[in-house]
Each structure stands twice: as C-alpha cells, then as structure tokens.
Amino acid sequence: MIDLTPQPGDLDPIETAPVEELRALQLERLQWSVRHAYDNVAHYRRAFDEAGVGPDDIGSLADLARLPFTSKATLRDNYPFGMFAVPREDVVRLHASSGTTGKPTVVGYTRDDLDMWADVVARSIRAAGGRRGMVLHNAYGYGLFTGGLGAHAGAERLGCTVVPVSGGMTQRQVQLILDFEPDVIMVTPSYMLSIVDELEAQGVDPRSTSLKVGIFGAEPWTNDMRREMEERTDMHAVDIYGLSEVIGPGVASECVETKDGLHVWEDHFYPEVIDPVTGEVLPDGEEGELVFTTLTKQAMPVIRYRTRDLTRLLPGTARTMRRMEKITGRTDDMIILRGVNLVPTQIEEIVLGIPTLSPHFQCHLDRSGNLDTLTVRVERRDATTDEEAAAAQAELGRRIKASIGVSVGVDVVDVASIERSVGKMRRIVDHRAAR
C-alpha cells in the first residue's frame, strides 16, 4: 500500500498543540457552550436548574460531570425544533434520523456550524490519507442522513474532486470506480464488502483498482475486518466516527500512519466515558459508554449526549488529541444470552478467524419456551465445499462457546443468502416479539 503519512505543515496547528493549550481552549469553549445552551434552550435551563448547577459553576473541565445527561429521548421529546438555540430562520439546514423506532431526531445547523463540520470532515479525510486533488468516491447516502452531505462538504473543503454516487446500484458503483479511477472511497464497511464482491463477480481483481484509501464509518467494524479489507483491496482501511446528534461524520478519525484508535477532534467535541449503569465518569483507559459535549455548535448545542456506543479513551499518538478505541458495540445492540453479555463485533472477530467463512453474517434471536436462543447465520465463501462448510459450522460453534461461555446455533448458508445493505448493516434480527 502507498505511504500516505502527512508531511510537516499538513496538519491544523491545534492537532499538535501542547496539551495545556488544548485544555485551555476546551474550557473556554465549554463555558461558552453551557451558557449558550442555558440561555437559549428551555430544556437545558430547566434540567440545569433541577440539578442545581448553572453556567457560572463550570470553572473546570471536571465540572462538566455535574451537569445532567442528554439522550435520544430528550431530543424526541422536544421534536422538532425544541432543542434549537438560535431562531429557526438562522438554521440553514436540517437533518434527521430515520425515525424507525419512534419520532426522528432532528438536528439543525447554522452557516458557521456547516463550516465547522466541513473543517472537521476535511481534517478526518486528511488524517485517513486523503489529499488535495485526489478523486473521492462518496457512497454514503445523501438526504436527511448526515453521511453523504457531510462527507461531500469535507472532501470539497480539503480540495478533492468528489463523485457524489450515494448508496445503492452496486454494479454502477463498480463501473464508476473503474471509469473515474478514484483514490478514496467513503462508504459503510458492510457495503464496501458488497462492492468488493461485485468487482470479483465481474472478474476484476479488487487489488487492481485505483483506490488507495477506504474511509469506513456509520457502523462498528473490527480490526479483523480491516485485515480482510486491506488484503482483498490493497488499500488503507481507516475508521471514521460521527453521529448526527453531535454533528454527523467527522467527530473522530483514525490516522493512516498508525490506525490504532480514532483521534477525537477535541477542539470541537469534548468526550467522556461513563459507566452505562451508574453514569459515573470513568478514567481514561476503562471501557464504557461514550458521551459527547459540543463546544462550538450554535444551532443545536448538546451537553453530555449519551451515544450508547461502547469504547474507551486512550492517549494521543500522532496528535495531541485523545483517541477513542474502535467502537466495540452499542449498549442497545448488546445481546444478553443466559446472563452473558455479547455484541456483534465479538461474533465478527470469530467469524473472520475461519478462512472458509465470509464476513457476511447475522445474529438471529429467538425464544424456545422461556429460554432465549441465538443462531448465527454466516455465508460460506465462493470456493468453500459442502464438507468445508460443515466443518466450519462446527468449528464456529466451538469457538463462540469457548469465547463467550454459552452455546449458540450456527447456520452456514450459501453465498448471497444474507441481505445486503447499502447503509448500516442489520446485524441483529430479533424474532422474540413475534412469539
């Protein structure tokens, strides 16, 4: 793979500033953001007053822990514009979640918010190996989902030539990759696998394309998936993180030179990790639920937003800013099976350790009597024989039991048996409510 290590002068000065300078900037911006939220959002004023804490009580970064949390339910309870801190006419764009489990969560942006967002996405693409003048194939979905437009604006801000393909039409994705010869692709990791499969189906070696960097986000993926992707495509596979409630993509990104955790852009987003049960702030290095406070957002500041993503904070490496470990799962994706907690990424690591199995899998939850059951459905690879598939099925069952301590069902199925997604992959299928 090509060396894309940044050169001196490529980075924003704050990325390598002394930690004391960064912390001073964070405190100044935190105090502004808390005051802005308190003065302009009725929910925050009421919540802070009930907690007995006000903007004047925030004298240090540690004081942030005195403030109450914000959740997705908070945003839905104030649907559609109740969390906005500026007049609606100052909001130049709206995005929203799909709302498949209730009211959508609506987020708004001022012109300055959009400029900041473009800056942090540009910083993320550059960290991942993107450079001015490169062609970037954007296969994130456009529309109310923040991925497509967020990636697009950041790539243009960096100076890339953007191909705004959006998601879907996999054969067309492949044709445009072959015709336009992009250097970078931004897409969900599960859909990248579909693109790679389609390249191979057309007789094209995925290692022979022009792609140098894949920036994958919107769903958790493991280092085993990275190895799979890099071996099959000969491009750097780099993680990007974001969520619409905070800004969209560009909250954090891995850097291509280390690929060992995502640098949080702490000059705009202050991270905490908490115990998901007690809400206690955990020290750096301990795994828990990720919480973010925006430091510069105007239209919709969020204070201590509970992401439900599980990770831990680590010291900076190539940059001053702390890293977050790759997301291991979500508190709401956690499967509790006979008292044992597991997340789909644990299954992914085991699946990818068996060469005759593909990365395409789903976890099916069901109930037999009063007992919850789990069946892992996973596709065999193209060249896998029936005998190898049977052996892989037995081996996967053994490895899962050895790893998590309980037995699960395993069903190795034919290629293309599991639904493909152009967005976030549906890893858990819960049949229990139908019983």
Placement of each model-derived feature along the sequence:
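Nucleotide 5′-phosphate-binding alpha/beta core
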Residues: 1-96, 101-119, 123-127, 131, ...
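Conserved S/T- and glycine-rich ATP-binding loop of Class I adenylate-forming
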Residues: 37, 97-100, 136, 185, ...
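AMP-binding/adenylate-forming
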Residues: 111-124, 135-194
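Conserved helix-loop-beta element of the AMP-binding
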Residues: 135, 202-221
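Short, structured coil segments at secondary-structure junctions
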Residues: 158, 180, 210, 232-236, ...
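AMP-binding/adenylate-forming catalytic core of the ANL superfamily
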Residues: 185, 291, 295-404, 423
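Adenylate-forming
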Residues: 192-210, 227-231
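Conserved AMP-binding/adenylate-forming
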Residues: 221-316
